[in-house]
């Protein structure tokens, strides 16, 4: 009879810990099952209304990811707004220059949140389950094994369900032709050795107003792969760039 009671207790502990340890993974899988995309711009750019609809594009990528489809998507998005793409910067009314600085996997959670809801949570749950059911010396060892085994199962479940966020950071410069003469003062501090700087200044006169902003696009989904995130990140950037015009 006593043996049956211990067996039932260990079975109950195992079931409870398995359920609790899998809650975090299951919750993440449900909440993040659909791809969510968000794009933000650091600064608003206001362009003067103009009947001139020619645009020169210069799209660069200095990240370590392949973004080879970006140029074509930006071109199409701009054309869909009624603008003509030209290969001549001199004849274009607008210049759009973009550089993808970073396209990488980033976790939406803070570091502490990741630890407390990930592996740390599973191990803590295992120890808690073992402590509660270790009600006498004869069963404590066996129940400890059950609790730790359940915790390891929970860790495996958390490892299989990962909340993934890919973020693309792009710097944008828009140049707009104007009939006025625009004077630009350039100042650059160049590092000299380990303790010195050389300051260079120059002044130039042109016919363009220049505006700069940064666009941050994020794609979030459980177990997201970059191959799935890439096209939507490119689409979001192309849409944002075209909407500046």
Curated annotation (Swiss-Prot):
Localization: Cell outer membrane
Membrane topology field: Lipid-anchor
Any Pfam family the entry gives: TraT
GO CC terms of this entry: cell outer membrane
Lipidation (N-palmitoyl cysteine): 23
The keyword RNA-binding is annotated on this UniProt entry: no
Lipid attachment locations (S-diacylglycerol cysteine): 23
UniProt entry keywords in alphabetical sequence: Cell outer membrane, Conjugation, Lipoprotein, Membrane, Palmitate, Plasmid, Signal
PROSITE patterns: PROKAR_LIPOPROTEIN
Alphabetical list of InterPro entries matching this protein: TraT_complement-R
Tagged with keyword Membrane: yes
Signal peptide, first to last residue: 1-22
Location, primary (coarse class): membrane
Superkingdom, natural source: Bacteria
Disulfide bonds, paired cysteine numbers: none
Family that this chain belongs to: Belongs to the TraT lipoprotein family.
Functional note: Responsible for preventing unproductive conjugation between bacteria carrying like plasmids.
Record protein name field: TraT complement resistance protein
Organism: Escherichia coli
Record gene name: traT
